Amino acid sequence: MQRSPVEDANCLSRYFFWWTNPIMRKGFKEKLRPSDVYQAPSQDAADILAERLEKEWDREVASGKKKPSLLRAMARCYIKPFLLFGFLLYIGEATKTVQPQLLGRIIASFDPAHEPERANGYFLAFGLGLLFTARFLLLQPAMFGLHHLGMQIRIALFSIIYKKTLKLSSRVLDKISTGQLVSLMSANLGKFDQSLGMAHFIWISPLQCILCTGLIWELIDVNSFCALAAISLLGVLQAFLSHKMGPYKAQKVLLTNKRLALTSEIMENLHSVKAYGWEEIMETLIKNIRQDEVKLTRKIGSLRYFYSSAYFFSAIFVIVAAVVPHALSRGINLRRIFTTLSYCMVLRMTVTRQLPGSIQMWYDTMRLIWKIEEFLSKEEYKLMEYDLSITELELQDVTASWDEGPGELLERIKQENKANGHHNGDAGLFFTNLYVAPVLKDISLKLKKGEMLAVTGSMGSGKSSLLMTILGELVPSSGKIRHSGRISYSSQTAWIMPGTIRDNILFGLTYDEYRYKSVVKACQLEEDLAALPEKDKTPMAEGGLNLSGGQKARVALARAVYRDADLYLLDAPFTHLDIATEKEIFDKCLCKLMASKTRILVTNKIEHLKRADKILLLHNGESFFYGTFPELQSERPDFSSLLLGLEAYDNISAERRCSILTETLHRVSVDESAGMQPERSAFRQVPPTKPMYIDERKASVIVNPLGVARKASFIQVPEEEVRRTLPDRKFSLVPENELVDESFMGSDVYHNHGVHMAGQRRQSVLAFMTNAQGQGRREHLQSSFRRRLSVVPQSELASELDIYTRRLSDSTYDMTGILEEENIEACLTDEIDEIEETFETTKWNTYVRYVSNNKSLLYVLIFILFIAAIEIAGSVAGIFLITDELWREEHQRSEPNMTKHSNASSSGQTYAITVTPTSSYYILYIYVATSESLLAMGFFRGLPFVHTTITISKKLHQKMLHAVLSAPMSVLNTMKTGRIMNRFTKDMATIDDMLPLLMFDFVQLTVVVVGCILVVSIVRPYIFLAATPLAIIFIVMRKYFLRTGQQLKQLETEARSPIFSHLIMSLKGLWTIRAFERQAYFEALFHKTLNTHTATWFLYLSTLRWFLFRADILFVFFFTLAAWIAVGTNQDKPGEIGIIICLAMLILGTFQWCVATSIAVDGMMRSVDRVFKFIDLPSETPKPDKGKDSDLIIENVDAQADSSWPHRGQIEVRNLTVKYTEAGHAVLKNLSFSAEGRQRVGILGRTGSGKSSLFNALLKLVYTDGEISIDGVNWNKMPLQKWRKAFGVVPQKVFIFTGPLRMNLDPYGCHSDEELWRVAEEVGLKTVIEQFPDKLDFQLEYGGYVLSNGHKQLICLARSILSGARILLLDEPSAHLDPVTIKVLKKTLRQSFSTCTILLSEHKVEPLLECQSFLMMDKGQVKTYDSIQKLLNETSHLKQAISPAERLKLFPRRNSSMRTPQSKLSSVTQTLQEEAEDNIQDTRL
């Protein structure tokens, strides 16, 4: 970016915005790029603004006042410019009260009694033009200054909120949601930019009302209060309508949230939706929700229409209430009438627009400031006291709990009870039932420099919490921790920040080439970096989406190792690595490169325990064992023999190792507890022995397993019962036997902060950071990286995508809190629209197509314009009648009569042109002519317009949804899910809520302005001649501005997204950031993103003001010309002069509003244009021509007639070539094979060999060339939906949508309950479903998070059985399954699918051993297709397809059933093995 010209611009250039001329010219001629945008002015730099406000806030906190005031801190920073701009605004508004006086003097100058003063009319008209000039010369800089000041306040608040976020303690992070934080910084703080311009009207409007009422009193006496009462009544009506809209908005938010949640699930699982052939039912589900949403949208739209129309219809109320009675009682005095009407125009704008807007602005602002004050006052992360002189690590009797809120509350209540004299009674009972369970209890250890401690233990035993305690994230309630303070940390879930791989490893540190290369080599990253197109400078996508899970884990480990620290905390860094890579890193990195460093490694592998200097074994937060491995063998022989005796313990999955370890520790601890009572810390109070509400608690655990608490509990639940109901978790901060009542989910034990709304619960920031809410909610975003990068194989990438994107959508659609989160999607979605091909404004064909979607809208517009033309014609006719009558009566009346009427006035002053009662017939004509432009649209003409546009919105949503669901996956794969969701969220919200009323306002204001110009032009044709060139100039100038303005707005939108992406990214890696002490580095990055956005936003505001400034100049010039022409061509008809000048003043007052509305409508029509682009997406099943229809029917007659097709399931593939995009490279090349009916074919190959691509080709989800036939029927001769329904699919990524379990099994409702229960029993789900409160009608949420991965796979099997599919496709079903569920899966395949053809894709050998034939693939080609016996001899092919670790397991596994158990196994081991065999069908939550 180049330096902004405003920095060197002189005063005139800044005042008239001449400095924007270069960017305006460039934007008009060519497309603007981000590099074309000027830098933000130095005064708007985020660091400067943040430092200034933070200084004042710290001063406020240090003042010692009971409650620090953010408003006072902001006032000390910004009060001077705020008051200065307010003063300019008041002077500019005050000129409006002088304008009617000059209008009255102009009319009075044409009084026959003041004929010598008629020459002053030119000067008075010129003075009126000067007043308008002075007004916009004051208002334009004032409004720009207020908007600029609002921008500065927003930037400063953004910065201090972000800085506070980096300081929040983990306990606080567990009480607030990510959605709340983002909503605070987006939907709320964004209001400062625009709404600050309304702030001063809170005091300007009352003053203006008083002044106008007093001046009207001088004109029409007591009737002035009637005018004020009439307009005030409209203000009360607006307040009532606003109040009525509240409940409707709340209901609409819930429905919108429900629709968007379901839409998000479908869009993120489009692959599965198409594979199952569920497009129609998914479309119906969303359509039903949308129907109810549109009904509420219509009600809200109607209320908004009446609210908006109050301004336009206010003139008629004033006329009826004040002007008409005065005219009927005292005759028509033109000076009084026109002056009064001019004041009433000022008054109606003040009462119906400015004052309500200002009150609403202050109400919203104060609520926002209070929220920010509360947020800034929250508890901060406290740095522990370190001793840099020591080199060892020591923990002494450390006890800690993640949430001591209930304990603190108890202490407070105890103190209050003591103060009140209550020592017993109910309070005592309360205390006996409430206890806090620490996550760590009396942990002691000591490590010398260079030693390695291996921490292992059961699930939820406190391993990660121990590391958090050492980091200082978890503050111990008792005990001491001593270490040097220089710590490096690698989190359990690899965290990748946006940037290059080198940036992620260096993490803001200086580059040391030797150290960097050593770390990369030790972490086994050399080959991966060499395969990347830009090596270690390859940019990472959000969350590292273009890296596999193992690659991300190694990058995160390299970051921790690169930092030179005294203590390294490594939280399960090998979770996603294969055995060979893990062994290399452990040897070369942990044991060699870091040999001189103190290391704490969380692991559950025996090999690591053997080589560690010390071992800490945790169970239920307590130290089960601490010492060396030989001491473990001698002191705990039962435990060590158990683990050492298990066959290939280190070779099974990490989840399974943890499960076995948990069961072992549980059994051993139970055996020990029979002989001795373990000591308990005084921290936990003994709970009551009698269980309370066990049945209710059991149901609660099933319904909401996320309620597993780290906080407190009212009840005692048997440990075995708790273990049975808890889901497996990779990361847990608490022992699994700790439960909590739902009333303790928030920070206040008296209130239920864990509120469920529409079946959802807000996710805390801590849960977001730790991913503690289970893997069931992990939803993966399929981005364009899936098809573009070759480093990560395609089939692996789908299973390795980070949870980051799904968490964004969770926060986006979480409406359980404040309603401001309704607009959160516009901020959270990281998608940036594709670069527009053109930089023109919205094309006219978009408007035409929008209107043509409902012909009723065209008829409504024609009707509106027709009525407006009739009213204009009637008004013009009335003007001629009035002026002719007045001219005739003026010449017929005698001077004495005129004097008589003049003396009849209450003030005794001679007023201009008092009309006799004989003219009362024409009174209505006068008022209709004056207020014609205000009533042009009428009352009932706007309501059909609003309802018709809402109907169009409904149709657009329906068409877009159908188009997306019907589009081929090859097209959808090139789009991010965020981009698709933006169309259904931000764009549809614009089209639903904002566009109808704004378009109506634009049409209405346009008719007002055009009607006024036509009226004055007809009365004085010379005005039309003067207006024509000015109108042409304005149209050209508008087009000139919009070319640049719309591009800058687009760039601003793109620059806004990284702000919130950075916030979300920082929250996810907050512990890593604080462990590395990189807060200042990330604050600098955040300020950089803020400055980038500020540059585009400030430039957009400046160019917009450039246009409005010149538009005002243009129309002030028009007003002055119109006034001079009216005065110069007058033929003793002061009524015409009054009408012309009044309407010209109305044009000036309405025009800028009309211009701003037109710009806003043009911007919103871009949302319509984007929706049309999605509607125009190609379809998978285009409608064929009639001629082709008949041919198709003839060729498919046999297949169509045979309702049992396919009956055998025979598959034949010939010369199949597959591409994911039409222009992409082939991922499968000339593939040919065949499978007989009922045959089981195993598909073997390395990740990326093309296994998943083959399944996609069979389902016609990709571009294909070649032939596939089932039972002799070619796929080109079969309808797409019927072809896909021939397959049953069990994908890697299981699709569980929000809705009843029954619908997830049988979406079309074709099967009875008996059939569903029978199938559930076949697949082993019956016992699971019976535990649900509503059985088959149990509501599944969040992708079925209450179900394990195994249960979801079984649901897919149940779907396949119910669908009657003859061919079953299983894509790596064992990837996330435990051994028990794998056995259930195998048994189901043998029994329920014995008559089906099965294609099983795996990269592991064991699940494939029961297959009859094997298709071995490599690099998209068939290497071998034969039996397992022959493949075992093809060692060269096996080496290419199977990893070394799996190759080691192949031969022992072949004859595992023939081996006898080793005699060394203890009875505990035998019991475990027997349970695994006996309880195959017992799948538990």
Swiss-Prot record:
Loss of function: phenotype: Considerable lethality around 10 dpf. No effect on initial pancreas development, but at 16 dpf mutants display loss of pancreatic acinar tissue. At 22 dpf, most pancreatic acinar tissue has disappeared and has been replaced by fibrotic tissue that surrounds dilated, mucus-filled ducts. Morpholino knockdown of the protein in 48 hpf embryos leads to impaired resistance to P.aeruginosa strain PA14 and strain SMC573, as shown by the increased bacterial burden, but there is no effect on resistance to E.tarda, B.cenocepacia, S.aureus MZ100, E.coli XL-10 and H.influenzae Hib EAGAN.
Binding site for ATP 1: W402, G457, S458, M459, G460, S461, G462, K463, S464, Q492
Main location: membrane
GO CC field: apical plasma membrane; chloride channel complex; cytosol; early endosome membrane; endoplasmic reticulum membrane; membrane; plasma membrane; recycling endosome membrane
Catalysed reaction, written as an equation: ATP + H2O + closed Cl(-) channel = ADP + phosphate + open Cl(-) channel; chloride(in) = chloride(out); hydrogencarbonate(in) = hydrogencarbonate(out); ATP + H2O = ADP + phosphate + H(+)
UniProt-listed Gene3D superfamilies: ABC transporter type 1, transmembrane domain, P-loop containing nucleotide triphosphate hydrolases
Extracellular side of membrane: 100-123, 217-224, 321-340, 878-924, 1020-1021, 1125-1138
Any one biological process term the GO annotation gives: innate immune response
Cytoplasmic side: 1-78, 150-195, 246-299, 364-856, 947-996, 1043-1103, 1160-1485
Membrane topology: Multi-pass membrane protein
Superkingdom of origin organism: Eukaryota
Glycosylation sites noted in the Swiss-Prot or TrEMBL record: N897, N903
Regions crossing the membrane: 79-99, 124-149, 196-216, 225-245, 300-320, 341-363, 857-877, 925-946, 997-1019, 1022-1042, 1104-1124, 1139-1159
Compartments, as annotated in UniProt: Apical cell membrane; Early endosome membrane; Cell membrane; Recycling endosome membrane
Start and end residues of each ABC transporter domain: 424-645, 1211-1444
InterPro entries: AAA+_ATPase, ABC1_TM_dom, ABC1_TM_sf, ABC_transporter-like_ATP-bd, ABC_transporter-like_CS, ABC_transporter_C-like, CFTR/ABCC7, CFTR_reg_dom
Pfam families reported in the protein's UniProt record: ABC_membrane (PF00664), ABC_tran (PF00005), CFTR_R (PF14396)
Domain notes: Binds and hydrolyzes ATP via the two cytoplasmic ABC transporter nucleotide-binding domains. The two ATP-binding domains interact with each other, forming a head-to-tail dimer. Normal ATPase activity requires interaction between the two domains. The first ABC transporter nucleotide-binding domain has no ATPase activity by itself.
Family: Belongs to the ABC transporter superfamily. ABCC family. CFTR transporter (TC 3.A.1.202) subfamily.
Assembly with partners or alone: Monomer; does not require oligomerization for channel activity. Interacts with cse1l; this interaction may down-regulate cftr activity.
Protein name stated in the entry: Cystic fibrosis transmembrane conductance regulator
Record organism: Danio rerio
